[in-house]
Structure formats: structure tokens, C-alpha cells
């Protein structure tokens, strides 16, 4: 198919934290329309593509994105108008060449990604198929197991927990719809437990609670209690996943990790995680970013030790970048990768990373950012790529729920063709 792009425009809008971000709208010659809003992270990897901010302290504390908007309207739009909306690979190649830098620092990854996503949306509308079918073809049918971030710590909360996310993983549910119900029921049960214990139950950036618990281990214990009280079996119906975001508690001067009030070497941290896995076996199923983003040695040792039974996810380690992923595959540094569109900055590069990981036998976890919007692109992306897993926040805050509701609609639309793999989605480990 060949349908020309006839108009591209961007504007500054707000994300879920009240910070500016880029929205892009694309119009095609047949009247088809697509729009996209770019998300933004709080704990960002140092190797991520650059999110361009204005730096004008008098406006949005320097976080405005008028430069990125201008780059779309003045530089990108004239170059992509007239291109075929159905040639996503060529479109993204043009965008990368237009920028010409390794980390998209000239035009901004937020400018490039907004256009890339909006064109994909417009093309799917022109083709008369949902976005997941357009990106993934006729075989796009696997609904992802949700990773629900219900207890927040680290950079996502002002509390005593070092580990950034404690997540519910309802891999024992028979369908996505039921998985969502399992998670919601535990979320409400958890709220009551925390409230009864005298904790504040206001929610953080991703919709989870941020209680001042005594230790990271107590957070795991409270989650297990909530799972049981909600009527489910931990390690069978619902599992627990951790996002340690260890770069945030790594001390560059000492080369050690500050966790639970003590300093640990990489080897000592491996023992700490191994203790948690064994003590709560088989409940902990996935650990993300257990080490600092350049501590390849600890990743390799940890994967050798527990990678057969626990999913070890590289986020800051890989930043959805095929060059870093290649190194990880070569070293066998992890058995899974977190996928974030805005870490790399285009749809094609994101799909390339997913494909490379799959070919290497690694799992893919499609992910949101802490600064999100009402955009549901990642829900379609998860189904399009049959990734089998998605991480998109807690069971509150409508920018998180928007993705879950989109997945409910997709599951309903697919009907009997829909597959929820549950534990089978974790194909890089044996359980």
C-alpha cells in the first residue's frame, strides 16, 4: 500500500506528573489520522536516547519541550510529508538520518518518537486494522501477563525502601481479564492491610502505595499477606516481581551498593537476592535491574547462579538498544529485556530490539514510564509482538488503567483466538 503523509504537527502537552511532553498528530492523504504522546522516565539509564528539554528555568522549571515541538514542526515535518506512511522502516531511517547523532540529541528522542508512533497509528487507521494487527500481523494474539507495581520505593517514592518496585504478577490466571481482577482484588486488600497498620495509603507516580516499611523484605511479606487475604495462593495464582533499579542505590565512589542500611559488594548483593529467592520460593519470579547499569560482571554471575529459575530483566543495562543487547547476549548477562519505546526513540528500533532478544531466547517485558499519559500504544505493542508480558503500573491512576482497559478490549476483540500464556510466557526459565 502507498498512502502519503500530508501533514505533521506537534504541540506541548502534560504528562501524569504535570511535566510537559510532546504530542504529535499525523494526517494522511486518504483522511486517516494518527496521534501519539511521548512518555518520560524518572530513573533513567545513562545510555538512553536524549529527551530534549528547553532548560528555560522561567518556564516549567526548565522542563518545557518547545524546542522538540519546533523540531517536529520546522525540521521533521517538511522532510516526512510526501513519504509513504506504510513504510515505517524507511520513515524511521529518515528520522535517524535527519538527527544524525548516536543518542538523538540533535532533534530529541521525544520529537522523533512522537512522529514515529503517530505515523504507525495513522497507517493502521488507513489499513482499517487495529494498531496491534498493523504492527504484528495476523498472528498477533498473545495477551501479556501484567506486572502490577503496587508498592513503590527508591526514586519513585519518599520512603525507606531501596527497591523501586514490588509487583504482583498474576501468571496463574486463565485470561487477561481474570489476571486484572486478581491484581485489583489484591491491590484493595493491600490498601486495607497498610491502612490498618497505620501507613499512609496515598499513591505514587505509578499508582502504587509508598509505605514506610522497615525493610525491603517486609514489603515482600506484606505483599504475600495481601495475596493470601485476597484468597489467592502466592507462587501459584500470583507471583512477585522486583525492580531493584540498583543504579539508584549504587555508590560510584565506593563501588558498593547501599541497601537495607548496609553497604554491599556485587557478590554480597548476589547473596542477598539469592537469599530472598530461596526464602520465598517459588514466589519471586522476576528481578529487574539487580545491579548498576555497567556492572556486567555481577549480572553474568547472578544469571549463572539463578537464571534457570528466575527471570533477570535488563532495563538500564540495555536501554532497548541493540548494541548493548548484543553485548548482553554475548556475555549471557540476563535472560530478559525490558522494552521502553522512549529509551531508544523509534518504533523500528524498538521492534529490532524485541526481535533480537527473542532470537536469543530471551523474554521481552514491554514497559511504561513513570511519567505516562493517556496514550495506549504500548498495550498494542505488547500484543503485536506476542511479548507475553507488560509492565504498566498499579491498579489506580487513569494513565495506567488506560493500558489495562485497552488490553481488555483487545482480548474481547480477539475472542477465541486470544491466548493468555500465564507462566508459559516466562519461556527463558524453568518452573
From Swiss-Prot:
It comes from Fervidobacterium nodosum (strain ATCC 35602 / DSM 5306 / Rt17-B1). This is Enolase. (2R)-2-phosphoglycerate binds at residues 164, 340, 369-370, 391. InterPro entries: Enolase, Enolase-like_C_sf, Enolase-like_N, Enolase_C, Enolase_CS, Enolase_N. Pathway: Carbohydrate degradation; glycolysis; pyruvate from D-glyceraldehyde 3-phosphate: step 4/5. It catalyses: (2R)-2-phosphoglycerate = phosphoenolpyruvate + H2O. Keywords: Cytoplasm, Glycolysis, Lyase, Magnesium, Metal-binding, Secreted. Its EC number is 4.2.1.11. One of its GO terms (biological process) is glycolytic process.
Amino acid at each position: 500500500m502507498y498512502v502519503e503523509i500530508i501533514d505533521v504537527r506537534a504541540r506541548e502537552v502534560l504528562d501524569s506528573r504535570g511535566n510537559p511532553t510532546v504530542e504529535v498528530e499525523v494526517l494522511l492523504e486518504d483522511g486517516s489520522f494518527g496521534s501519539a504522546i511521548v512518555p518520560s522516565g524518572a530513573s533513567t539509564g545513562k545510555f538512553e536516547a536524549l529527551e530534549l528539554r528547553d532548560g528555560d528555568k522561567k518556564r516549567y522549571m526548565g522542563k518545557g519541550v518547545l524546542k522538540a515541538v519546533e523540531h517536529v514542526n520546522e525540521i521533521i515535518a517538511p522532510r516526512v510529508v510526501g513519504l509513504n506512511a506504510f513504510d515505517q522502516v524507511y520513515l524511521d531511517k529518515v528520522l535517524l538520518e535527519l538527527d544524525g547523532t548516536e543518542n538523538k540529541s540533535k532533534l530529541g528522542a521525544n520529537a522523533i518518537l512522537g512522529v514515529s508512533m503517530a505515523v504507525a497509528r495513522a497507517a493502521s487507521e488507513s489499513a482499517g486494522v487495529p494498531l496491534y494487527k498493523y504492527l504484528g500481523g495476523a498472528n498477533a494474539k498473545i495477551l501479556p501477563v501484567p506486572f502490577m507495581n503496587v508498592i513503590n520505593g527508591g526514586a519513585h517514592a519518599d520512603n525507606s525502601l531501596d527497591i523501586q518496585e514490588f509487583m504482583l504478577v498474576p501468571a496463574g490466571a486463565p485470561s487477561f481479564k481474570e489476571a486484572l481482577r486478581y491484581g485489583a482484588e489484591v491491590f484493595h486488600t493491600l490498601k486495607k492491610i497498610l491502612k490498618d497498620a497505620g501507613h499512609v495509603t496515598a499513591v505514587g507516580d505509578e499508582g502504587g502505595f509508598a509505605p514506610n516499611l522497615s525493610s525491603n523484605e517486609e514489603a515482600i511479606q506484606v505483599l504475600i499477606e495481601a495475596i493470601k487475604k485476597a484468597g489467592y495462593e502466592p507462587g501459584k495464582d500470583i507471583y512477585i516481581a522486583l525492580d531493584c533499579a540498583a543504579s539508584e542505590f549504587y555508590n560510584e565512589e565506593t563501588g558498593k551498593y547501599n541497601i537495607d542500611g548496609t553497604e554491599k559488594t556485587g557478590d554480597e548483593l548476589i547473596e542477598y537476592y539469592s537469599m530472598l529467592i530461596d526464602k520465598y520460593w517459588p514466589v519471586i519470579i522476576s528481578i529487574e535491574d539487580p545491579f548498576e547499569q555497567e556492572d556486567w560482571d555481577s549480572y553474568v554471575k547472578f544469571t549463572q547462579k539463578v537464571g534457570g529459575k528466575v527471570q533477570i530483566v535488563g532495563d538500564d543495562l540495555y536501554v532497548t538498544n541493540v548494541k548493548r543487547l548484543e553485548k548482553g547476549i554475548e556475555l549471557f548477562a540476563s535472560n530478559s529485556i525490558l522494552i521502553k519505546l522512549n529509551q531508544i526513540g523509534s518504533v523500528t528500533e524498538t521492534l529490532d530490539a524485541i526481535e533480537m532478544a527473542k532470537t536469543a531466547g530471551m523474554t521481552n517485558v514491554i514497559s511504561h514510564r513513570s511519567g505516562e499519559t493517556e496514550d495506549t500504544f504500548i498495550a498494542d505493542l505488547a500484543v503485536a509482538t506476542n511479548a507475553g508480558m507488560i509492565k504498566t503500573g498499579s491498579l489506580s491512576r487513569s494513565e495506567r488503567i488506560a493500558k489495562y482497559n485497552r488490553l481488555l478490549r483487545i482480548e474481547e476483540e480477539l475472542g477465541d483466538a486470544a491466548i493468555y500464556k500465564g507462566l508459559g510466557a516466562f519461556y527463558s526459565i524453568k518452573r
